[in-house]
Each structure stands twice: as C-alpha cells, then as structure tokens.
C-alpha cells in the first residue's frame, strides 16, 4: 500500500501532527490527535459524521460520503483501515485490495475534511486482548462461515467510535448482518451515536458494488449477476409467502452452476426468524472461485391470496 511521502511528525511536546495535508484533506494516523481535533470541532458547534471503511473505495463508499456530507454543519471523517481482526487465518487479508492514493483522491472529490488511516500496531498495540462478543447472531449466516469475523468487526468499530466520537455513522446495507450487529452493540452498550444504513449501490446490471468484485474475472463478473437476479425473484415471490421467497431465489441461483451457494435465508429485519407477514430481509452468500460474495434485499411478505 503506497502512502504519501509526508510522514507523521511531532512537535516539541511529542504531540502527533497530521501525516498528510493536501487540498483541504487532512490525514491523521494518531488516535489521540484525531480525538482532539473532533472534540474541538464539536466544541465549536459542528457535528462529526463518520464513514468507516477498509479502503479500496468504490461508488458505494462514495454514496456513504455524500450522505455524511449532507448533514448540515458537519465535518466528515473517513477511516481507511484494513482490519486484520475480522479476517480468518485462511482468508484474504494479505491480498485484500489496497489503493491508498486513489482512496484519498475520492475523499478529496467528495469534500471529505478528515481521513483516519492508522497502522495496525497503533490500533492493536502489544498486549491488546479486548474484543466485543457479538452474541449468538455473530455465529449465524456470515458468522458461521467466518468464525471470529464479527468479533473483530465490532471491536474495530467500537474503537473507531471511541476515537472519532461521531454524532452519526454511516454503513452500507449490503453488509446487512454487520449493520444489524453494530446497531445492537450501540443499543446494548449505550453508545451515543446514530447509526444510519445506506441502501446498496449497484452496477447497471444489478451487481452490488463491493471491493471484492476486483477479484472477479470477466466471466465470473457475468456469472455474479445471478445473485442480484435471485434477490429480485425472491422479492416478486413475497406475495406467495416466505417459503416461496426462498424457493424462487434458489431456483435462479441453481441456473448458474459456477456459483457455490452457502446460504439463502429469509429473516426479519433484525435477523430474527422470518415473519409470515410483513417486512423481511432475503440474504444470500455464494462463492465464485475463491471469491465470497454476499448480498441482500428487502422483501414484503404478504398473505397468499
């Protein structure tokens, strides 16, 4: 990962200065410095909005930034941190896409004022042992396939909340289980931040925007569209009841043999059991080669006529 040439400096009191300043964008790597900056902004009457990311930014992240920037009287912080604690030992941490300079350029284009880009040993210094337990939901769906993933995710999000102290934080709805767990953590731990879910940004053919789409070759990219098509089929089947929703989605997925489907599940919006009538969420996970893809959509389940 290429970093800007202006490295972190310190004043005579040992306080960390910004590591990078250009065109109105300031990049901080030190948590204490960023905390002081956001505290001063709140003291001056501004609100702080946060967009947590792992970098490799795309148009889905761009929409998160725009939503954050739309809050009147606010200053937006975008975090760029590939969090090792949410990757399993056989997962793609080492090859996860990293494009630091391009990420900064997108932040500048969207008028973001602050970027937080810490090093791993800053976030997890020697002796760090604390983690957030996601509870039973953390072992279901994505958690069943990726043990420890949600504990690592919640831990870093909790740290980002403590460092940035945002008034509002924005997360994409594509990672619906992540969003549900973050909302539950905020509720259970009385964290004073408003969590906003932003609808999934899609390609023109329906594929959900994702940093991991970069792993797909041209053939896989075409095959991946079956996931969003399956979600659409499930939505149309909502008026026939919950079982029909799942069956319709599975039928579409079965038409694409390259997809190794992990799960197709209909749940309540907070990921409890699926309702027989009302709002629900259809969630799909599948692999194309070595790439794991997830997506979800709202479904309105109604009574059979």
Where are each of the predicted segments found?
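Nucleotidyltransferase catalytic core that binds NTPs
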Residues: 3, 8-259, 266-267, 290, ...
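Short, motif-level signal for alpha-helix interfacial/capping segments enriched in acidic residues
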Residues: 35-39, 271-278
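A conserved acidic, glycine/proline-rich C-terminal tail/linker
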Residues: 260-275, 284
């Amino acid at each position: 990962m290429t970093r800007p040439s202006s490295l972190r400096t310190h004043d005579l009191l040992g306080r960390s200065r910004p590591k990078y300043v250009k065109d109105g964008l300031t990049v901080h790597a030190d948590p204490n410095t960023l905390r002081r900056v956001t505290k001063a902004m709140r003291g001056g009457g501004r609100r702080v909005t946060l967009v947590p990311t792992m970098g490799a930014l795309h148009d889905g992240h761009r929409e998160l930034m725009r939503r954050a920037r739309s809050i009147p009287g606010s200053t937006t912080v975008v975090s760029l941190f590939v969090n090792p604690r949410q990757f399993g030992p056989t997962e793609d941490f080492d090859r996860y896409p990293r494009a630091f300079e391009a990420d900064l350029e997108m932040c500048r284009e969207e008028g973001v004022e602050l970027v937080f880009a810490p090093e791993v040993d800053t976030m997890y210094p020697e002796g760090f042992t604390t983690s957030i337990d996601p509870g039973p939901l953390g072992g279901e769906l994505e958690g069943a396939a990726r043990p420890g993933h949600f504990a690592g995710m919640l831990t870093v999000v909790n740290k980002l909340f403590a460092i940035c102290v945002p008034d509002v934080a924005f997360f994409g709805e594509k990672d619906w289980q992540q969003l549900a767990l973050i909302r539950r953590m905020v509720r259970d731990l009385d964290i004073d931040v408003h969590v906003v879910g932003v609808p999934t940004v899609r390609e023109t053919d329906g594929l959900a925007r994702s940093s991991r789409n970069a792993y797909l070759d041209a053939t896989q990219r075409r095959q991946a569209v079956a996931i969003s098509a399956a979600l659409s089929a499930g939505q149309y089947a909502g008026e026939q009841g919950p079982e029909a929703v799942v069956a319709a989605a599975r039928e579409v997925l079965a038409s694409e043999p390259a997809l190794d489907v992990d799960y197709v599940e209909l749940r309540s919006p907070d990921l409890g059991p699926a309702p027989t009538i009302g709002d629900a969420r259809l969630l799909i996970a599948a692999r194309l080669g070595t790439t794991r893809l997830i997506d979800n959509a709202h479904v309105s389940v109604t009574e059979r006529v």
